[in-house]
Amino acid sequence: MKAPRQQSLFPKLCEDTAFPKPVNVASVPQRSPFRYPGGKTWFVPTFRDWIKNYSPKPEILIEPFAGGGIISLTALFEEFVSRVVMVEIDEEIAAVWQSVVDGHAEWIAKRILSFELTKESVIDEISRTNVDLREKAFQTILKNRTFHGGILAEGSGFLKYGENGKGIRSRWYPATLSKRFSNLKLVADRILFCKDDGLEVIQEYSRRQDVVFFIDPPYTAGGKRAGKRLYRHFTLDHERLFTLCESVKGDFLMTYDNADEVKMMARNHGFQMRLIPMTNTHHATMQELVIGKDLSWMDRYAAVHEPIAEYKTEGKRKKVPTRRSIGRGKP
């Protein structure tokens, strides 16, 4: 049976525009020491296209849900902003970024190089309690690099097979990780790190016109379960987030799960939406939503067609028709 033709999100573009391919993350400078679930390395080229349009350039970039921090680090290393504010509420991830800001990046780099990694040595190390901040940061990196998918949330465990049967050594690259931490020393004095609620920090900076936000919240809207599985702190008031974004005097760029509830909130707050392709951890091509005040700079991108998707909501499964174009705030 022939599949029905899907509508373009950008109907004004020509019909024969090639379907865009997901970004090959190997082509993007790897700045973050984390192998982070839901990381945004693949989004870096799009982020560059957005932020380079500003003249004068923004003073500060705020990442209220920093996680692996690749967007903030890109903004610093490539001189898109003078400073960044990185916000993360998870205490283990926070330990890493706070250690970097406090001047312990080189200590962590050397600790990584000297560590003899076996399953037993990792268990011994991460079982230690009453450790100081930099030791906690090292424990976090160990877990992130040896646990399945880099997931730190409760219930995660060691890689069993990994790449080519290497098990927990599959993602442990001491020289590479050490160099990434050493490089972080170059920008550490331009990072303000806050272990805090991202929504509170958005509100704090909302009146500043020289500030831009990159917002990548945990995906739990509409009963989505990925955020609950991947992150320790997954509870989020999504409606409040959209309300805060509407109040910011500067600008923001948000990435979100392609869910009907999210699109409804974006329309209700008058935001524009676009879809962008990405490859998930299972190497399947998916689409994520890009949300902002003005996404006209994305109009030169190739058209992205929205698939007919089945969304799982709390209590029941239902098919959500997605044939409508996601235009500039169209209802």
Language-model features: where?
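A residue-level signal for conserved active-site and pocket-lining positions in enzyme catalytic cores
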Residues: 67, 97, 141, 252, ...
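Short hydrophobic/aromatic-enriched beta-strand-loop microsegments
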Residues: 83-88, 109, 214, 270-278
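Long, positively charged, glycine-interspersed low-complexity recognition regions
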Residues: 3-11, 233-331
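Short His-Asn-centered micro-motif
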Residues: 64-65, 87-89, 194-196, 215-217, ...
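Conserved S-adenosyl-L-methionine
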Residues: 56-117
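Short, surface-exposed loop/helix-turn segments at secondary-structure junctions
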Residues: 227-233
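SAM-dependent nucleic-acid methyltransferase catalytic core
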Residues: 2-51, 55-56, 94, 100-214, ...
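Short active-site oxyanion
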Residues: 58-61, 81-83, 188-192, 246-252
